Amino acid sequence: MAKADKKPAEKKPAEKTPAAEPAAAAEKKPKAGKKLPKEPAGAGDKKKKRSKKNVETYKIYIFKVLKQVHPDIGISSKAMGIMNSFINDIFEKLAGESSKLARYNKKPTITSREIQTAVRLVLPGELAKHAVSEGTKAVTKFTSS
C-alpha cells in the first residue's frame, strides 16, 4: 500500500503544477512577447545595416560572358566562386605590375599604357595578344561614346 500511496501523491502535484505553470506562462508570454520583438527587431535591423558589406564580385559578368559563348551551358556556384577568385587574382597581379611600371618610370599615374604593358608581362603568349586587342577595342569604344 505504501507504493500505491506514493503514485497518487506524485501524480497530484504533477497535475497541479502544469495547470498552474501554463496560466503563469500564458500571462508572462504576451508581456515578454511584446517587449522582445521590438528590441531585437530594432537591434537586428541595425546589425543588418552595419554588417551588410558591399562585396563586389564578377559573378554577374562571368555569367553574361558564359551565356554569350555557350548559351546552353550553366555553371555551379563552386565553379563561379573559383572563376571569381581567378579574376580577382589576375586583376591584383595586373594592378601590382602596372603600379611597379609607373614607379619605375617615376610617373604618379597609371595610364592605359602601363596596363597594356602589365598585361603583356603577366599573361602568356596568345592570351596577352587577345587581351591587348580586346582592351584597346574597349578603350576606343569608351572614349568615342
UniProtKB/Swiss-Prot annotation:
Localization (cell): Nucleus; Chromosome
Post-translational modification: Can be acetylated to form H2BK5ac, H2BK10ac, H2BK15ac, H2BK27ac, H2BK33ac and H2BK34ac.
Oligomeric form and interacting partners: The nucleosome is a histone octamer containing two molecules each of H2A, H2B, H3 and H4 assembled in one H3-H4 heterotetramer and two H2A-H2B heterodimers. The octamer wraps approximately 147 bp of DNA. Interacts with ORTH2.
Protein role: Core component of nucleosome. Nucleosomes wrap and compact DNA into chromatin, limiting DNA accessibility to the cellular machineries which require DNA as a template. Histones thereby play a central role in transcription regulation, DNA repair, DNA replication and chromosomal stability. DNA accessibility is regulated via a complex set of post-translational modifications of histones, also called histone code, and nucleosome remodeling.
Keywords, sorted A to Z: Acetylation, Chromosome, DNA-binding, Isopeptide bond, Methylation, Nucleosome core, Nucleus, Ubl conjugation
InterPro entries registered for this protein in UniProt: Histone-fold, Histone_H2A/H2B/H3, Histone_H2B, HISTONE_H2B_site
Predominant place of localization: nucleus
Low complexity: compositionally biased ranges: 16-25
N6-methyllysine modification, residue list: K3
A GO molecular-function annotation: structural constituent of chromatin
Similarity-based family: Belongs to the histone H2B family.
Chain residue ranges for the region called Disordered: 1-53
Cross-link Glycyl lysine isopeptide (Lys-Gly) (interchain with G-Cter in ubiquitin): where in chain: K141
PTM sites of type N6,N6-dimethyllysine: K12
Name of the protein in its database record: Histone H2B.10
